[in-house]
Regions:
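Activity-critical C-terminal alpha-helical subdomain
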Residues: 323-325, 336, 422-473
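Short glycine/threonine-rich loop-to-helix capping motif typified by GTGT followed
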Residues: 2-3, 14-16, 269-271, 315-328, ...
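C-terminal structural cap/anchor segments
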Residues: 345-401
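Glycine-rich N-terminal segment of FAD-binding domains in flavoprotein oxidoreductases
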Residues: 18, 43, 52-149, 162-168
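Conserved oxyanion/phosphate-binding beta-strand-loop segments in alpha/beta enzyme cores
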Residues: 28-48
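Intrinsic disorder at enzyme termini
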Residues: 2-25, 37, 42, 452-473
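Extended C-terminal subregions enriched in glycine
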Residues: 127, 348, 392, 400-412, ...
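C-terminal substrate-binding/cap subdomain adjacent to the FAD-binding core in PCMH-type
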Residues: 6-10, 161, 180-349, 356, ...
């Protein structure tokens, strides 16, 4: 490629970027022209070397803020020609460097933030759109995505790569299971529109594919009629067995529109177990509370807490807690999150053992959550889950003190708990801060590993995409 003094340049032998070709040696080649920004400055690169976890720090050589999917096509083709690794970063909510790339180029998808269309046929949105932005926009049309994560300030592209779990997953699957079509850029730099009927192999590989086959630039998402109001229910249990049985019963008959469990410290060093659910409606209709709560048998000593709030406020329920964490500084501390899918038959055993092994102060400052999941609702080819039909996603979302010893202890906990979960038939959820070697990934995929390798060879043969997952050596 001819060199232009107005473009950054890359020297392939020393793997060095230069701000312009005028500063580069004769062997350097100019980067392609971009509509957006391609920057090499240290502050931009340092930002891309961080994520919500504050555990892994990989410094990229450059950052692309694309103006369009064509910018990503140009970058990926250039990267293929010169062996440069590339990753796409959304809201950087990954806890373990999954979207980072040492010495490569990070694509900052926040510049791709347009909502193109909203109708009963679906929402067409860029990958960098946040779910909070999308929900506000769809509610103006009395529509909503079927599944929303508890924290809405995540990017659409980011959650579709890993699945995306929320309180309605037990009814509708992952967020990635509610996608109608995608626009992607493969690891070879091909811009392709795909769906269940058009390039289905690519479509089903990318959803939940951990960024290994293509980068999502736009998605068409399923929408459904939205209510105006959510009636919320908080039921308290003093033992884990009745709590898990109640979650299983409520999930089986799908009486709630969202459903999860939460563990909180109780009196005198005990633990309390909450069933947190909602029933959505639009007045003058309203839920029948006795019928909704039938058979759930919470503690008689603690009255259920029942309240009405707007549907948006309920879906955005974590916003106040996040604001407090940001104000206290805890948001910028390390977050060694633990997330694992468990077979329902082993969930109580694992949860009890895990919680008994952790200091009470860890549980007190964490979000400890349990989501029921129905296997038949899940369709992502490469999100591995236990073989039982009834599952739970168990999350221990901790914040570590900003000291090496505290972080090392919690990361050790994660590895120990993961080994125990594997022994009970569990599977890691890929967002977790659990170190994995390529051999660990092969074990994770099991019989699907050969297909995963084949798809990688087809769509990203030079292995330039998303190395931060650590799947390939």
């Amino acid at each position: 490629m001819p060199r232009s003094p107005r473009l950054p340049a890359f020297e392939p032998h020393t793997r060095t970027w230069y701000v312009s070709a005028e500063d580069a040696p004769p062997t350097a080649v100019s980067a392609p022209p971009f509509e957006g920004e391609f920057v090499l400055d240290a502050p931009s690169r340092r930002e891309m070397a961080e994520d919500f976890g504050h555990i892994v720090h990989r410094m990229p050589a450059a950052v692309l803020r694309p103006a369009s999917a064509e910018d990503i096509v140009r970058l990926v083709r250039f990267a293929n020609a010169h062996g440069i690794q590339v990753s796409m970063r959304g809201q950087a909510h990954s806890p373990f460097g999954q979207a980072q790339v040492e010495g490569g180029v990070v694509i900052d998808s926040r510049s791709l933030h347009r909502i193109h269309a909203i109708s009963t046929q679906g929402a067409v949105v860029d990958a960098g759109v946040r779910w909070s932005e999308l929900l506000r926009a769809t509610l103006a049309h009395e529509l909503t995505p079927p599944v929303l994560t508890g924290f809405l300030e995540l990017s659409v592209g980011g959650t579709l790569c890993v699945g995306g779990v929320g309180g309605a997953t037990y009814r509708y699957g992952f967020q990635a299971d509610n996608v109608l079509a995608l626009e992607v850029v493969t690891g070879q730099g091909e811009r392709i529109e795909c769906s269940a009927t058009e390039h289905p192999e690519l479509f089903h590989s990318v959803l939940g594919g951990l960024g290994q086959f293509a980068l999502i630039t736009r998605a068409t998402l399923r929408l459904q009629a939205a209510p105006t109001t959510s009636r919320t229910y908080h039921l308290t249990y003093s033992d884990s067995q009745r709590w898990i049985e109640a979650l299983r019963l409520a999930a089986e008959d799908e009486r709630f529109d969202s459903l999860k469990g939460k563990v909180v410290p109780g009196p005198r060093g005990t633990l309390s177990y909450l069933l947190i659910a909602s029933k959505d409606f639009t007045p003058p209709q309203s839920p029948n509370d006795p019928e909704v709560l039938r058979g759930l048998n919470p503690d008689a000593s603690v009255a259920p807490v029942i309240a009405n709030e707007s549907y948006f406020d309920w879906m955005n329920q974590l916003a106040p807690a996040v604001a407090r964490l940001e104000k206290s500084g805890a948001w910028s501390q390390p977050h060694p999150w633990f997330d694992v899918f468990l077979p329902a038959s082993q969930t109580r055993t694992f949860v009890d053992e895990a919680l008994a092994s952790l200091p009470l102060e860890d549980i007190a400052q964490a979000f400890v959550l349990l989501y029921p999941v129905k296997r038949e609702r899940l369709g992502c080819a490469f999100i591995e889950v236990p073989t039982e039909q009834r599952l739970f996603l168990f999350d221990i979302l901790r914040t570590a003190a900003p000291t090496p010893a505290a972080l090392q202890r919690m990361m050790g906990d994660n590895q120990r708990l993961h080994e125990r979960a594997l022994g009970l038939g569990g599977k890691k959820y890929a967002i977790a801060a659990i170190p994995f070697t390529p051999a660990d990934w092969r074990e994770y995929f099991g019989p699907d590993w050969s297909l995963f390798e084949q798809r990688k060879a087809r769509f990203d043969p030079r292995h330039i995409l998303t190395p931060g997952q650590g799947i390939f050596a």
